């Protein structure tokens, strides 16, 4: 009998070698079985995997192993999102080359992932910094350029003064660079852009079809795309107040119904009218410069103090030429949204109200709630931005906001200003084109050449890849490619004259926007093999963090459309199913306070519990340290647990089982040593129970019992099988874990009975069937333990290649049913009764319930309504 403790250090490497030797997880594209593509967001090669990686990749692995067992041809690849600033920072700080640093990290992290026992097809592995990968990315760029999906223009950009590069709007968080944390500046640079806005409406409309995406992510993308319907409205300017030749100002508004509440107009610092005013007024010029130094992102504008300067220009109200409004330059108006000009209605918008209070502008309520009184309705500290009834709005009074919108739009569409309609209905989007130019070395080179005679010339595809020169230095800030003595100098492909290469590289989000397609045929000379891509895509289940809801996921959706437009794929959407997992979090520990606070790692402390109070003390000195909040594991707070330590101490299966067991997969999991030890005890318990009975089970035939002593065992196993199937299908891993715990509790006594030789043939057969089901159920989560148990009971072949078991329908039928019992329509109790009980038996059982007795108080019910198999209602 196998009574020794389970030793993962022995078993896990052995089974990993067996899987590798048999190439169990290598996938053939021409396999006739139904396909299933599961993909976790590939990692940045920082050098170490963390527990968040363990959870993410374990979830994907459970899905891959389960679907493989269900008969699917599963594609489960892995690669590396390998370009980016950290490699350049390492080059500057440590004097190493980004390529060497990156590939060294990849080797270390690959070894860590291998130890986890993941069912990955490593034959498809690539890193985005491989020239073979970015050659095909450059190919896509040239196809997009030819299709008109790429263009180049002067643009105000977010400049990160620490990383010395341009950031997309989405990469500016609260006015700071998403990676460096530096305050972002604005600069004018010539940039390359992808025309993502060509797909704005389609990207928005198609969200409704992504039924297997979290609603939260779809809503975030919808808000980011930001479709709005409104009016482009032309305001006449008082010529006596205009410093130049401009006669009118066009404003985009989504609330033309509030026109009679307008008290000012505001324009962007980059609006032509603002430039005219700045040319004549030093104070306006200085204010415009201040605005330009702020970030360009909406987030930056929303968090900044709202400021403006009166230009002295006056605009005439569209419905009353005698009514003039001041025109301000304001720091919250974006030139690239709408027309770069707005009108402010302080009573209907909080930002406008704050601005009006600050600069002493009038506040006139024009919309009130339907149940409010116009005579008493006022605006104090909060604007009213909801729907309602129009007031103080002349011919609009009494109309609803929707009716007023139509009335204003229709009236102004018919009126003219200088021979053209005063207003035009417009649809606007918040989404901006994607600026991809980055002034750095460690990225995919943009494959164009600049020639004085020919202009911008694409690099011929035959000359791809444009590779990065290895001989660069990082002793100065900025882009080393700009300083390279030879790389940037090249002959023009068209005229042969001296020309220069584009020295900007692509935003690293480009690299991750199509990698899922490359995995379908990474050996292909072109970016994709359309046959393979169209077979495998869309990805059936994509797993990653919700922090990528906008950036990566939206860019990938654009890329799939652009690749379809250029003939590389046939579908619009990259990911059919999306799951956003929670984080792994841990307590924080520290000593000292304020600037003297020093964070302490979990490995350095011991937790003592004295009189119900938890104390953390340093193992080395016994000094007590403070127990802080539970937070996402981070290097800065040192509340990290090294996966190598956990796997080294407990084994990969324990680590995998714990990260799946403790909480729903979309919620954060709190890491605790006690939880890990509990998972490890369960691993040992399963091994002990199966191992002790293994000798008796080896020669037995597996057969579920239909009656007698073994019936309850078989019912428990087959019901658990059916339930866990449903849990795996829904990615409800924690529920599956709970059911497996219950099944082991049921099997404990029978397995002990079999081990002792006290079970008859029928019970032994039922126990072997149930044990086989248990092994199949744990295999996706704890694959090494499952293989070891399977071998121990005499199973043939590998569990990793074994088909999923089928439950016996006769054994999963529940003979009892629980009916909710209502009294006068309100639920008061539950009744558990035989499923085939007739109405008379149900009524008798209901009348015997304490809650019903109390309600009747000795009287008879007026009526008992029984809805078969559903509900009972007692009418008193």
Curated annotation (Swiss-Prot):
Cellular compartment(s): Cytoplasm
Which SUPFAM superfamilies does this chain map to? Anticodon-binding domain of a subclass of class I aminoacyl-tRNA synthetases, Nucleotidylyl transferase, ValRS/IleRS/LeuRS editing domain
Molecular function as annotated in GO: aminoacyl-tRNA deacylase activity; ATP binding; leucine-tRNA ligase activity
Any one biological process term the GO annotation gives: leucyl-tRNA aminoacylation
Protein name, please?
A: Leucine--tRNA ligase
Question: Phosphoprotein as a keyword?
Answer: no
What family is this?
Answer: Belongs to the class-I aminoacyl-tRNA synthetase family.
Q: Which UniProt keywords apply?
A: Aminoacyl-tRNA synthetase, ATP-binding, Cytoplasm, Ligase, Nucleotide-binding, Protein biosynthesis
Motif span ('KMSKS' region)?
632-636
Q: Which gene encodes it?
A: leuS
The record ties this protein, via InterPro entries, to:
aa-tRNA-synth_I_CS, aa-tRNA-synth_Ia, Leu-tRNA-ligase, Leu_tRNA-synth_edit, M/V/L/I-tRNA-synth_anticd-bd, Methionyl/Leucyl_tRNA_Synth, Rossmann-like_a/b/a_fold, tRNAsynth_Ia_anticodon-bd
EC annotation from Swiss-Prot or TrEMBL = 6.1.1.4
Supply the source organism for this entry: Sinorhizobium fredii (strain NBRC 101917 / NGR234)
UniProt binding sites for ATP: 635
Q: Which reaction does it catalyse?
A: tRNA(Leu) + L-leucine + ATP = L-leucyl-tRNA(Leu) + AMP + diphosphate
Q: Where is this motif: 'HIGH' region?
A: 43-53
GO CC annotation, single: cytosol
Q: What is its main location?
A: cytoplasm
Keyword Lipid metabolism assigned to the entry: answer is no
Spell out the PROSITE patterns in the cross-references: AA_TRNA_LIGASE_I
One short Pfam name that applies is tRNA-synt_1
Tree of life domain: Bacteria
Extract the CDD domains matched here: Anticodon_Ia_Leu_BEm, LeuRS_core
